[in-house]
Amino acid sequence: MSVDELAREQAILDAAAELLCRIGYNKLTMGDVAEAVALHRGLVYLQFKSKDELVEATVRRELGRYARAWRAHLLADPHAGSVASVYRAMVHTLSRLPLAAAIVARDPDILGKYPAKPGNVFERLANTGTRDFLRAMQAAGTLRPEVDVRTTAYILDALTPAIRRTLPIGDAAPADPERPSADQLLETLADLLERALTPDGADLARGKTLLLDELAHAHAEFDATPNRQEGTLS
């Protein structure tokens, strides 16, 4: 792919990301994207043969950014290696990446009917989630051995949309004054997770190393974009 083609692809992905956040998957059209980047619709189809292929590429790129930012925060956190450190990094990162926050929370306003479509990108990224992080930490001894990883992952994933609702993202309405801020929620959640899941004397350095390895694996999955064929307007 030439430099011009790479630049065009990134411009298309930038436009798709902005439009997903603004109007959502259900209303998004390839024509909208073409108009946003001032290209003929046919040139957009030369890069991505369908709307779903474009959305997949946009999701993969955003999750790659999410993984890189998450990794940077873990590297800078002297207490990284516990479950709580994962959530400290998650909240810090999602508050800065609104599309990633919508993707992680499977926000129906943004993703619409896409996650229910057969062959969607989330089906192929099913193994790069919370359960993998918990298994890595249990193997490192930074998660209590008696913890049921599958159930804990399910509970923590269910909390993600609630966490996201506390984040000041985009043009969202002011938060309910009775609702805790992201910092307050994170402080309480981190304390609960540390008390319930982290064993005494845990080797956080080892946990941090394994977490970074898991993130590297996830990043590779996000970057493994399927080969695309030249699209048509039909």
Residue map of PLM features:
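Short amphipathic alpha-helical elements of helix-turn-helix/winged-helix folds
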Residues: A15-L19, T93, L159
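Helix-turn-helix
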Residues: A11, L19-E53, A57
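Generic hydrophobic, amphipathic alpha-helix propensity
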Residues: R8-A16, V33-A34, L54, T58-Y66, ...
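Short linear capping/connector segments at secondary-structure termini
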Residues: V104-K113, A173
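Amphipathic alpha-helical packing segments from all-alpha helical-bundle domains
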Residues: K113-T142, V147-R165, Q184-E187, D191
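Helical hydrophobic small-molecule/effector-binding pocket
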Residues: A84-R106, N120-D132, D157, R164, ...
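C-terminal peripheral helix-coil segments that are non-catalytic and often amphipathic
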Residues: T128-A140, R165, I169-S234
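Hydrophobic alpha-helical connector segments
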Residues: A57, R68-A102, R106, V149, ...
